[in-house]
């Protein structure tokens, strides 16, 4: 679990679940964003995003809780700078 994964989840949420747009905004590759999110989901043992095939469809209920926690963590990290 790391801040990059948190940023990827946050940006995917901000970009209407569009991983390509999230990757562009973060200056990285879409497959890298997708892989990082999947790894975070596996580590946490929750599905953050519901998928249809490879596309993100919605944020799950557990995902909403994860996203809220990520937002708090990222805000606190920002306060350290």
For the regions a protein language model found, what residue spans apply to each?
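Alpha-helical linker/hinge and terminal dimerization helices associated
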Residues: 43-44, 66-81
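Pre-recognition alpha-helix immediately N-terminal to the DNA-recognition helix
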Residues: 7-11, 65, 72
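DNA major-groove recognition helices of helix-turn-helix
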Residues: 9, 39-40
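Short helix-boundary/capping micro-motifs
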Residues: 12-27
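Hydrophobic two-helix hairpin corresponding to the core of helix-turn-helix DNA-binding domains
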Residues: 9-10, 22-23, 60-63
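The N-cap/first-turn positions of alpha helices
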Residues: 2-5, 30, 63
């Amino acid at each position: 679990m790391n801040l990059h994964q948190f940023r990827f989840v946050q940006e995917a949420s901000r970009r209407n679940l569009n991983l390509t747009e999230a990757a562009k905004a973060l200056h990285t590759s879409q497959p890298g964003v997708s892989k990082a999110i999947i790894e975070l989901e596996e580590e946490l043992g929750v599905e953050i995003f519901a998928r249809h095939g490879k596309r993100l469809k919605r944020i799950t209920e557990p995902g909403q809780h994860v996203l809220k926690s990520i937002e708090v963590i990222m805000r606190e990290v920002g306060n350290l700078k």
